[in-house]
Structure formats: C-alpha cells, structure tokens
Amino acid sequence: MINQYKAHDHQKFFPFESMGTCNEISCIGGKCSADKSKIACGISNLGRLDSCIVYSVGGNNQWEFELDILEKTNCEVHTFDCSGPAQRFVKPENDRLHFHHICLGATRSAGPLAEGKPCTREKELCGETWTMTDIQSHFSHKQIDLLKLDIEGWEWTIFDQDYAAAAALGLNLPMQLLMEVHYCVPGRRNPRLECRVQHNYTLETASDVVRFQSHLLKNGYVVVNRDDNPSCPHCTELTLLRVSC
C-alpha cells in the first residue's frame, strides 16, 4: 500500500481529494487545464462586489489571468514577481492592475538588487522578498478575496509565518487559493525548480504532502477542486476555499 505512493505520478497527491463542492467553477486566464489558466470558485459572486482584492504571485510576465479577472470583476489586482530584472515585466495598461517587483516568502529579505549586486537571470530572485503580512500591511489590504500562486516549490513558505500576529493587526488570510502544487522528483541530472528551493519544507514524499495538506487545513482551507496536470505527473492544480475564519 505504501509503495503505491512512491511512484512518480499523481497518486502522491491523495491528501488533496476534494472535501467540499463549488456550485460555480470557472477557468480564468485560458481554457480549462491550459498551462496559464486557473480554476476559480464563484467568480460571478466576486463580480457582483463593488470592490475586491486579488493577488497574483509569480506571473512570469504572463498576464492572461490578470486580464480575465479585470474583465469579469471590479477587483483591484496586484501581481508580485521578483524573478529577473524588473524591466523584463511589461504590465498591460489598466488602472486596476498593479505590478510589484517583490516575491512572497516566509521571511523578509533584501535581494541582490537592493544590495547593489548584479542580477540579470530570469529565474534568479532579484528583487526583495516580503511576507504576506508585510504586503498586506504596506498596502492596507485587510482582506484578500483571491490569491493565485505560481511559485514552483515555494507554496508552503507563504503560510509559514506568524498569523496570530497578523490577526492582531486586523489582517485576514485570503478567502480563496488557486495554486499548482509540485513535489520534488530527486535523482535527475537537471532537477526542476521544486527540487532546488532553499527552505525546510520541500515536498518530496507522500508524508510531506500530508503535512502540507494538514498545514492548510489548520489554517481553514479545504479543497473544492483538484485538476491533475496530464503533462506533469508531479503537479496538480488546486482550488481551496477558507471555511474556518
């Protein structure tokens, strides 16, 4: 039984079976299951709000998701990505779309550019890294309605911080998460990014995936949709709602 979770396939994501249902599933940023699209829950409800906040983390200068959100809602969209030099990002013109050459992580760090060091490679984290609490405090965003993550291998670090302190500041966790989760496949000659991340929570074994799911559950998140990537046996797209606030 245990051996079945050692294979390089989607079975390792068994902890992320759906725990609830969503009455309205929408594909944002492209066709369903396309590489650049995400599966969201209740976008029409978000569209009825006069104002809302959406964070898009790790866009890699691809704006399909943001433009679709802007078209379907009245939300203010903030995109965060510190990989490579800032000038490589070309933000579409829209008063509700904002780009920040910042990454999100568990701790705050300056980054090579702030330290006066050269940084030109697109995969290198050139800008500053801020925590979610830093970001929300800086922009006075007490509530994030939707958080989209494309940060291969760094998913855990976003939630590895002191949320009790954040709550004391009146800051709330995002109400909905859209993220692709990756686990590391060791032993490759050129390991993918998720095997080269530098933190203590690399997802590699089925036990690691269980711990990550448990960590999300403790923060109130349940899976309402899972979409395994057919082109990537160690990747799955998750839609999670926060049901415990």
Task: Kindly give the residue locations of the regions a language model identified.
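Phosphate/nucleotide-binding beta-alpha loop and adjacent structural elements of enzyme active sites
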Residues: 1-245
